C-alpha cells in the first residue's frame, strides 16, 4: 500500500494484519541523512518537516510501516542522499522502495547501491519509462531487460 508518511498508521490499522507491505513516503531534502516527512495532504502545505533518516525509519516502524518509499529521486540526481537512505535502511533492517526517474539506464546502479548497503528487501518503482507512449502498454522487452539486470545484480 503506497502511503504518505502520515497515512501509514491508519492504513496498517485498517488492514488489521502485518502481511501487506505498507510504505511511507519520504522525500529528498538536498542533505544526505535528512529526509522530508511532511508528505501528507496538510503537512505538505506547511513548513517542511525534516528529520534524520533514522528518525523517519523509527517513526515508520512505530506506525506499522514496512518500508520507505523514497520519492522523487529523479533517477540518480540525489545519489548521495539515496546512498545515505539505503545505508540507514540496512542498519535498521527496513525495506526500501526507490522511486522516481528510474529507467533502463540507471536501474542497475540504483539497485546495486541498495544491495551494496545491505538492504534486505528492495522494491524499485519503475513507472512510465517502460510504457509505450503510443499504446499505453508495458514494453515486454524492457521487462525482460529489467529481469536480466536484476538477476545479474543478485546473482
Language-model features and meaning:
Residues 7-16, 55-56, 102-118, 141-142:
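Catalytic cores of alpha/beta
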Residues 14-30, 80-98, 146-154:
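Alpha-helix-loop-beta-strand connector modules within alpha/beta enzyme cores
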Residues 49-54, 79-86, 139-142:
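Charged helix-capping and loop-helix junction motifs
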Residues 55-62, 87, 112, 145-148, ...:
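Charged/polar, solvent-exposed surface patches and flexible loops
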Residues 61-123:
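Conserved binding-pocket/active-site segment within a compact domain
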Amino acid at each position: 500500500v503506497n502511503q504518505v508518511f502520515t497515512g501509514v498508521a491508519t492504513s496498517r490499522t485498517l488492514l488489521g494484519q502485518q502481511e501487506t507491505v505498507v510504505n511511507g513516503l519520504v522525500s529528498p531534502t538536498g542533505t544526505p541523512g535528512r529526509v522530508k516527512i511532511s508528505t501528507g495532504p496538510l503537512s505538505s502545505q506547511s513548513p517542511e518537516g525534516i528529520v534524520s533518516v533514522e528518525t523517519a525509519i523509527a517513526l515508520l516502524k512505530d506506525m506499522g510501516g514496512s518500508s520507505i518509499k523514497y520519492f522523487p529521486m529523479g533517477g540518480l540526481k540525489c545519489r548521495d542522499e539515496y546512498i545515505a537512505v539505503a545505508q540507514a535502511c540496512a542498519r535498521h533492517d527496513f525495506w526500501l522502495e526507490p522511486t522516481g526517474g528510474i529507467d533502463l539506464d540507471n536501474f542497475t546502479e540504483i539497485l546495486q547501491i541498495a544491495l551494496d548497503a545491505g538492504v534486505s528487501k528492495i522494491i524499485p518503482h519503475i513507472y512510465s519509462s517502460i510504457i509505450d507512449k503510443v499504446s499505453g502498454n508495458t514494453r515486454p522487452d524492457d521487462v525482460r531487460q529489467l529481469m536480466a539486470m536484476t538477476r545479474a545484480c543478485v546473482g
